[in-house]
Design a protein with these regions (language model features):
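Conserved phosphate-binding elements of NTP-dependent enzyme cores
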Residues: 1-944
């Protein structure tokens, strides 16, 4: 049947070579191949793009204009396509209001649960707050034994100062005769004069009643009168016994604290009715951080201790500070920490209303001569952040601010009314702070009355299902209140995956981009089971993946190759994992069958004997640990997801080194001390962010080789005769570039209701340069033709020019020989951008004292790419540098000289050092999950 396959004919997106592919439906299909071979072009730019486009095309033109345009992918035909949903690596929302709970929609169910079965508890008197109708009040009183005497009271004044004259007049008008004032009963005419400075309580006596048959309607009328007078409150005061307070609103019967009608939107921190008024539902407030304003307190004011006021473009603030200090008698040559407390406060927070004389002349002759109060550096930053219209200034001021938990709601984001509503003693904010594993325990053990149970059961099922899906994809250490913008790409993707599993759709084609990123081997098995569960609902899963376990678990594998870029784009093999392993053409198959492998290094380096020692690391979940980083080695930090690796390396170590060596202002996480920094000269973070934000940035400009190439062109005889310098060969400045397209080579034409069309510039035909510039040639090629060469081609072409050859060789060495010199930076994948940065580092003349940090460098890399990456990293270490990677990939882990394994679990149960040492030593540690998997791998490698 043709219906059980997706059949692609003639796919040509990017580097795909007009390929035909058949993919079985309702199966777990892995698309694999080298980085840059065309996997994403097939999965995302062909299959997903066409599935999405067909859906959008079926909508009206009016609806389409809101959905953004979908280009038709370059493919002849695709048959058997289902509606497509893509779950990719783009981190979710950057909106501070977006949390794990809102992204997964669990918050909607929590709000419903608390609104329907939550009990409000007064925060002042700690008694349950409920609301009763007059009928319920009558029923409660009729439960008292017969002949009980009581009076129905209406509390009109509670604990208020004043003589309450108007209140008594109103009561008299209503026709009542008795009142209770501060516990004593009086006739209205005999009430003594009240002390206006004391607090008083006034209750109107509505009726005096003895419980007997036939009293119901009289009681009902009395309660109605009481509720009307006091705006919703009544008291049944048993003579010689207790009094029973009633309220028809959700309000405390003692202090009047009101919660109001419980409805789901009340529990949303994104609705004004529920949000904390202080922080407007953000849970944190931006405050100026003294440590960022004065990072080094041993400096004097004259040496620039106040970072924000150091001279940049004008001397205004330095002059202001100097003249204030003179007036206030503060010595600018005393280290800041040696100034008195009062003087430090004056500089930071100002001098109140006291004025001093300030004289200032700017560079343009403008003079300011005034008596002004001194507002203080911190108040100045606050004011400028609030008042400025300039984004630049706001961004500058933001650098000195830190988000602190809101003092009013303690970071729960909700107002006091909402936080008063509890289930099993917990409010919605407290439950959102629990790690998902603990939240599951809470909801499984929650106790309800019989009636509540009926209401809560369906809501609880939805909540527990969704929480369990999140546990199954390996993020049980996250909390629902965690801000979505602090999640890593892998976490964000797995959360969206859990949401999709929760939506229970079937007949959909899901396209996933490396869901195993950032997952430890241990958590991988659960992820694979989740993927299979989605498949079993009747969905097709197309997963772009390099992970060996996922490939072995797949129903079908498509291997794209043989190389990358222009050398890729063909189907090398397609079939079940067993068929792929037998294929001679498939590189992936050779690694899966063990014909090819990444060798374990023959020996582990001893290092240079020096260390960086970090003591008392305690940010997030780190348990006050001491970590020793031996220098001159290849170090790998491992541990299950959420064990604290990123906190240790990115939030603490990297920021300390960047602050001390690069004058960076990002504030490191909590730690006690660090030693050994003098043993390194610079810290270099090589991440997967793009090497340039615009299409004008490309590998040639980024690695600096383009400067050398332009220099070379300017040295040619033709260029010398015409008087061209190297600026003539730049497509970014006037002179040599084509002015019709400003050196872009393409022109964007906007079309309404249709996708924007990019056409080659008709003046320069996409070459970016004007015809005069293109007449200058080196070895028969002009500058535009050189930009269109791949790195491998250029390497042969410039083999006689050592300076150019060296830079190109390093790009070739990191496995990017297939990239063209002029390829726009925006089209490089994260893995390619990271390796481009490595290449740029490799050709810098290193003095062997650099400290490189890489966070999961194997993202997007095939086993064969990893082999190359490792060779490059080992070269950096051989030159005497230190390389520190955070990594789960066992091929990288087994190749390191030194491992630091954190754990044992993720979240609260993590943050300890489980093992350190060489891979062989860590493999012997039974408590280490990494060690267990490493042991299997090292044994398997020996067997092969």
């Amino acid at each position: 049947v043709a219906n059980d396959k997706i059949i692609i004919h003639g796919a040509r997106a990017h580097n795909l070579k007009n390929i035909d592919v058949k993919i079985p439906k309702n199966k777990l299909v892995v698309i694999t191949g080298l980085s840059g071979s065309g996997k994403s072009s097939l999965a995302f730019d062909t299959l997903y793009a066409e599935g999405q486009r067909r859906y959008v095309e079926s909508l009206s033109a009016y609806a389409r204009q809101f959905l953004g345009q979908m280009d038709k992918p370059d493919v002849d035909s695709i048959d058997g396509l289902s509606p497509a949903i893509s779950i990719d690596q783009k981190t979710t929302s950057h909106n501070p209001r977006s949390t794990v709970g809102t992204v997964t929609e669990i918050n909607d169910f929590l709000r419903l649960l608390w609104a329907r079965v939550g009990t409000p508890i007064c925060p002042n008197d700690h008694i349950p707050i409920s609301s009763q109708s007059p009928d319920q009040m009558v029923d409660r009183v009729l439960e008292l034994s017969e002949r009980t005497r009581l009076q129905i009271l209406s509390p009109v004044v509670r604990d208020k100062r004043g003589i309450q004259k108007k209140v008594f007049e109103k009561i008299k008008k209503e026709g009542f005769v008795r009142v209770q004032v501060d516990g004593e009963t009086y006739e209205l005419d005999e009430v003594p004069e009240l002390d206006k400075n004391k607090k008083h309580t006034v209750n109107v006596v509505i009726d005096r009643i003895i419980i007997k048959d036939g009293i119901r309607s009289r009681l009902f009328d009395s309660f109605e009168a009481a509720l009307r007078l006091s705006d919703g409150y009544a008291i049944a005061d048993v003579i010689g016994g207790d009094s029973i307070p009633f309220s028809e609103k959700y309000a405390c019967t003692i202090c009047g604290f009101t919660v109001g009608e419980l409805e789901p939107r009340l529990f949303s921190f994104n609705a004004p009715i529920g949000a904390c008024p202080e922080c407007e539902g953000l849970g944190s407030k931006l405050e100026v951080d003294v440590d960022l304003v004065v990072p080094d307190r041993t400096k004097t004011l004259r040496e620039g201790a106040m970072i924000p006021w150091n001279p940049i473009s004008s001397q205004y603030y330095p002059q202001l500070l100097e003249q204030f200090c003179e007036a206030a008698g503060i010595n600018m040559d005393t280290p800041f920490n040696k100034l008195s407390k009062k003087q430090q406060q004056q500089v930071l927070y100002g001098n109140g209303d006291q004025t001093f004389h300030f004289h200032y002349e700017n560079d343009f002759g403008g003079v300011r001569d005034v008596d002004v109060p001194f507002e203080g550096v911190i108040n100045n930053i606050k004011r400028r952040y609030k008042e400025t219209n300039s984004d630049f200034t706001r961004e500058q001021m933001r650098k000195y601010m830190t988000e602190l938990p809101c003092p009013a709601c303690h970071g729960y984001r909700l107002n006091q009314r909402v936080l008063a509503v509890k289930i099993n003693g917990q409010n919605i904010g407290e439950v959102s702070e629990l790690p998902i594993s603990k939240a599951i325990t809470f909801f499984e053990g929650v106790q309800f009355s019989e009636q509540q149970e009926k209401i809560a059961r369906p809501i609880l099922k939805e909540i527990l299902d969704r929480l369990t899906f999140m546990k199954n994809v390996g993020v049980e250490y996250l909390t629902l209140s965690r801000s979505a913008r602090t999640l890593s790409g892998g976490e964000a993707q797995r959360i969206r995956l859990a949401t999709q599993i929760g939506s229970n759709l079937s007949g959909v084609m899901y396209v996933l981009d490396e869901p195993s990123i950032g997952l430890h081997q241990r958590d991988n098995d659960r992820l694979i089971s989740s993927l299979k569960a989605m498949r079993d609902l009747g969905n097709t899963l197309i997963v772009v993946e390099h992970d060996e376990d996922t490939m072995r678990a797949a129903d079908y594998i498509v291997d794209i190759g043989p190389g990358a870029g222009a050398n890729g784009g063909k189907v090398m093999a397609a079939g079940t994992p067993k068929q792929i392993m037998r294929s001679r053409k498939s590189l992936t198959g050779q690694y899966l069958s063990g014909k090819k492998m990444i060798e374990v290094p023959k020996e582990r380096r001893e290092g240079n004997g020096k260390h960086i020692i970090l003591k008392g690391a305690a940010e997030n979940n780190l348990k006050n640990i001491n970590v020793d980083f031996p220098l001159g080695k290849f170090i790998c930090v491992t541990g299950v997801s959420g064990s604290g690796k990123s906190t240790l390396v990115n939030v603490i170590l990297k920021r300390i080194l960047a602050q001390k060596l690069n004058n960076n202002s990002a504030k490191p996480g909590k730690y006690k001390s660090i030693s050994g920094i003098r043993n390194i000269e610079k810290v270099i973070n090589i991440d997967q962010s793009p090497i340039g934000r615009t299409p004008r940035s490309n590998p040639a400009t980024y690695t600096g080789v383009f400067d050398d190439i332009r220099e070379l062109f300017a040295q040619t005889n033709q260029a010398k005769m015409r008087g061209y310098n190297k600026g003539r060969f730049s497509f970014n400045v006037k002179g040599g570039r084509c002015e019709a397209c400003h050196g872009d080579g393409i022109i964007k034409i906007e079309m309404n209701f249709l996708p924007d069309v990019y056409v080659p510039c008709e003046v320069c035909h996409g070459t970016r340069y004007n015809s005069e510039t293109l007449e200058v040639e080196y070895k028969g090629k002009n500058i535009s033709q050189v930009l269109n060469m791949t790195v491998s081609e250029a390497l042969k072409f410039f083999s006689a020019i050592p300076k150019i050859k060296r830079k190109l060789q390093t790009i070739e060495d990191v496995g990017l020989g297939y990239v063209t010199l002029g390829q726009p930076a925006t089209t490089l994948s994260g893995g390619e951008a990271q390796r481009m940065k490595l290449a740029a580092e490799l050709h810098r003349q290193s003095r062997g004292k650099s400290f490189y940090i890489l966070d999961e460098p194997t993202t997007g890399l095939h086993m064969d790419d990893i082999k190359r990456l490792l060779a490059v990293l080992q070269r950096l270490v051989d030159a005497g540098n230190t390389v520190l990677v955070i990594e789960h990939d066992l091929d990288v882990v087994k190749s390191a000289d030194w491992l630091i394994d954190l754990g044992p679990e993720g979240g609260e149960a993590g943050g300890y050092i489980v093992a350190t040492g060489t891979p062989e030593e860590v493999a012997k540690v039974k408590e280490s999950y990494t060690g267990q998997y490493l042991k299997k791998m090292l044994e398997r490698d020996k067997a092969l």
